[in-house]
Amino acid sequence: MRNRPRTLVALLVTPVVLLLAGCSASNLPRLGLPEPVTDNGHRTLALWQGSWVAALIVGAFVWGLIVWAIIFHRRRGEHIPAQTKYNVPIEILYTIIPFLIVAVLFVFTARDEAIITKISPKSADVHVIHVNGIRWSWQFKYEDLPANTVVTGTPDHIPTLYLPLGERVRFDLTTTDVNHSFWVPAFLMKMDLIAGRTNQFEVTPDKLGTYAGKCAELCGRDHSRMLFNVKVVPPAEYNQLLNTLKGSAA
């Protein structure tokens, strides 16, 4: 009987230790998310971390109360303790606290969502790239190039989308058939391509590299092969690429 509290603590702590053992020191602060490579990605990561902190605080408090009740208020003998019901102050407290928690999470989420989905005015210096989903690949058209300059991929030939480092980019998302979803995990951002409408979002890449992208909406037979790459390059290299594409389309 005396070892029961220790056993209970061990049962609670062991799963947490095993879970943390699967994370490296560099990955642990991100709590399962990849390292962000855009300005909006850092904001998404901060929101994710804040939500986890709130969840852990609430969870620790609730589990603490449960363990406290199990250890110090377990039933002893045949004595039945006083039964408490219809306690209006406690019921009000149980209603207000969850409401406040949800309200705080909502405020921060709404604030960050408004920033992440904000579109720059037409007068702003923004690179516009039209992304069209097709079964089962992608078409990329850079607005700075002639209309007939379209990079089209296939399930066997994965297309590459080039972005300039440190410069604002807007994606105009459309589909010519079924619904798809444009997802680059390193962006910490996913947006659907819905038939009959154009969805938009903007990012500013802040890290050079090549990042995998994919369709995140089940769209048919070759959905799993609907892949693409995103390569973030220096602005000079990006402009050179556009000139090369323009020359090949001439």
Residue ranges and their predicted role:
Residues 24-50, 70-250:
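Non-transmembrane, membrane-proximal soluble domains of secreted or membrane proteins
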Residues 1-25:
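N-terminal secretory/membrane targeting signals
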Residues 2-8, 42-61, 96:
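Membrane-entry segments of alpha-helical transmembrane domains in multi-pass membrane proteins
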Residues 59-73:
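Alpha-helical transmembrane segments
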